[in-house]
């Protein structure tokens, strides 16, 4: 009887251990899968021609999902820590907010005007939107999901970038051929002349970089002493970004990317893209350059270490993504 009781206790303990082990294994695989899914680097491509966003896994280089948003999506910015994607819809005068964990549309923010380019501050509390038609920059609270400020700026504000070092909003005024710089309190710090028809802009450290569409050039502006110099690129440059001390410029006529070494001040490579390349962004995990091709409804992907063309992926109609569009 005692022996049987001991066996029963042993069997019970064994069963409990087995159940706990099984439960822990399930938890392990669940959370491993969860973190794996949420650590995937993705590109969010706004397709202005069919009112969608193509979501692309940058590890497998495959489209994960095509999401319907507002009419004529163009500008974009991503809050990396909050995992939120803000998409500007020109045709419906609003912003679509996407949850980047589940890739679902969670909010539509009415603006009452057409959004062009988007950027966000480093604290991820504010999203800035250029209002081309009314010459404003709108500030959206990322927490309240509503417009909290309309700042009057120069004529036809086009591109906008956020400088983390100085907490500046850096804005191109296309038809005025100027760059305007505002601090975190929306005070004008400086207005400076650029080349002809400035559009895309990028800013980090002590510099701002501006693509001058009609001059086939890029202006580099020192944010400390306000000196500047220019270098020539391909025909009709649309946007510029810097990665590892190298400037990359989209040339919409000629279908190329100019790769410019900022140290030697020389062009080191010309990359062939799809038709009418407009915007670009970088994936840090796989060292990828991703370029949106408005004319061929696609993205071109390159390795930034050897400038090797990896793949062209068909997306939606008129792919643009004016802003930061890669979730790292």
Predicted features and spans:
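Predominantly soluble domains enriched in secretory-pathway, periplasmic, or organellar proteins
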Residues: 2-4, 8-328
């Amino acid at each position: 009887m005692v022996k049987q009781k001991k066996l029963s206790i042993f069997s019970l303990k064994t069963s409990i251990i087995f159940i706990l082990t099984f439960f822990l294994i399930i938890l392990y695989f669940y959370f491993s899968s969860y973190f794996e899914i949420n650590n995937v680097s993705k590109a969010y491509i706004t397709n202005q021609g069919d009112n969608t966003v193509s979501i692309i896994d940058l590890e497998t280089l495959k489209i994960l999902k095509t999401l319907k948003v507002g009419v004529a999506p163009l500008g974009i910015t991503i809050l990396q820590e909050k995992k939120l994607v803000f998409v500007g819809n020109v045709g419906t005068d609003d912003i679509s907010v996407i949850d980047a964990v589940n890739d679902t549309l969670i909010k539509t923010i009415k603006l009452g005007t057409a959004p062009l380019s988007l950027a966000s501050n480093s604290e991820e509390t504010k999203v800035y939107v250029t209002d081309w038609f009314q010459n404003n920059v709108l500030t959206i609270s990322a927490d309240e999901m509503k417009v909290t400020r309309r700042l009057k700026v120069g004529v036809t504000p086009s591109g906008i970038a956020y400088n983390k070092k100085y907490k500046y909003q850096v804005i191109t005024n296309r038809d005025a051929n100027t760059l305007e710089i505002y601090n975190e309190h929306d005070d004008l710090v400086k207005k400076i002349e650029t080349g002809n028809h400035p559009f895309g802009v990028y800013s980090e450290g002590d510099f701002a970089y501006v693509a001058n569409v009609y001059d086939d050039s890029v202006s580099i502006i020192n944010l400390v002493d306000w000196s500047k110099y220019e270098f020539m690129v391909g025909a009709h440059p649309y946007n510029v970004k810097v990665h590892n001390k190298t400037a990359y410029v989209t040339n919409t006529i000629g279908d190329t990317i100019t790769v410019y070494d900022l140290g030697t001040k020389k062009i080191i490579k010309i990359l062939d893209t799809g038709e009418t390349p407009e915007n670009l962004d970088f994936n840090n995990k796989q060292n990828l350059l991703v370029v949106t091709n408005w004319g061929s409804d696609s993205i071109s992907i390159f390795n930034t270490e050897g400038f090797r063309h990896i793949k062209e992926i068909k997306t939606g109609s008129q792919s643009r993504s004016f802003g930061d569009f890669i979730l790292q």
